[in-house]
Amino acid sequence: MKQVLLGGIHFYQKVISPMKPATCRFYPTCSHYGKEAIEKHGALRGGYLTTRRLLRCQPFHPGGLDFVPETFDWKAPLQRENPAEHQK
């Protein structure tokens, strides 16, 4: 399952993304975030983190720095209160 998800992200990055203008509100981009999340936390947890990230990547969210967490917690809030926490 992990390889299927990573293959989908790779396809998006190489085929679809170059045809679109850059619109991601975050750094790293959502596709890079998804790739790292799945590699670091596996298909289920990484897929969950990626889905949460994609739901936040919309015009009503300010975006900013949002790195894949080192540890995974199902109960973690959907968004950290202080994006500067990522810069530590």
Curated annotation (Swiss-Prot):
Q: Does the keyword Transcription apply?
A: no
Alphabetically ordered keywords of this record = Cell membrane, Membrane
Organism superkingdom: Bacteria
InterPro entries to which the protein is assigned, alphabetical: Membr_insert_effic_factor_YidD
Subcellular localization, as worded in the UniProt entry: Cell membrane
Its GO CC terms are: plasma membrane
The principal localisation class reads membrane
How is it placed in the membrane, per its record?
A: Peripheral membrane protein
- Family label: Belongs to the UPF0161 family.
Question: What does the record give as the function of this protein?
Answer: Could be involved in insertion of integral membrane proteins into the membrane.
Against PANTHER family, the record matches this protein to:
MEMBRANE PROTEIN INSERTION EFFICIENCY FACTOR-RELATED
NCBIfam families for this protein: membrane protein insertion efficiency factor YidD (TIGR00278)
According to UniProt, the name of this protein is Putative membrane protein insertion efficiency factor
